[in-house]
From Swiss-Prot:
InterPro entries: SmpB, SsrA-bd_prot, SsrA-bd_prot_CS
UniProt record similarity statement: Belongs to the SmpB family.
SUPFAM superfamilies for the chain: Small protein B (SmpB) (SSF74982)
UniProt name for this protein: SsrA-binding protein
Gene name of this polypeptide: smpB
Length: 155
């Protein structure tokens, strides 16, 4: 996510995905949204925690991401909060992802959502699930780093 092509503004970050999965590669994807979804995203009412992506019929889909209904519009014009949304990727990227997801048993996880200029983008990670001992190791390493920082602060 470089700032060379335009301004970027982070909307939400899926920190739990980085704890539960080992991220091997990341991809930037556009996302197909309705007007009320964009307004809710601008208000910051989105949750990526339970989301994942699938490749179906040669297209990428973002599933189970919760975008709260826009409060200013009525119920009739609003969207379904957990609807399946289409991801916009290049054909080469989709073909590469199909091979890696099917052969290696990897997962596609949304890592963050941000505005790039006026477009909503999703950073998708090709991920491999961590084992319990890997998660414990991560927690231990994090705690050790905190302890070292506290010790350095005292000096």
């Amino acid at each position: 996510m470089s700032n060379q092509n335009g301004k970027t503004k982070l909307i939400t970050d899926n920190r739990q995905a980085r704890f539960l999965y080992e991220i091997l590669e990341t991809y930037e994807a556009g996302i197909e949204l309705t007007g009320t979804e964009v307004k809710s995203i601008r208000a910051g009412r989105i949750n990526l925690k339970d989301g994942y992506a699938l490749i179906r019929n040669g297209e990428a889909w973002l599933i189970n991401v919760h975008i709260s209904p826009y409060e200013a519009s009525g119920q009739y014009f609003n969207h379904d909060p957990r609807r399946t949304r289409k991801l916009l990727l290049h054909r080469k990227e989709i073909n590469k992802l199909i091979g890696q997801v099917e052969q290696k048993g990897l997962t596609l996880v949304p890592l963050k959502m941000y505005f790039k200029d006026s477009w909503v983008k999703v950073s998708i990670g090709l991920a491999q699930g961590k084992k319990l001992h890997d998660k414990r190791e991560t927690l231990k390493r994090r705690q050790d780093e905190r302890d070292m920082q506290r010790a350095m602060k005292r000096w």
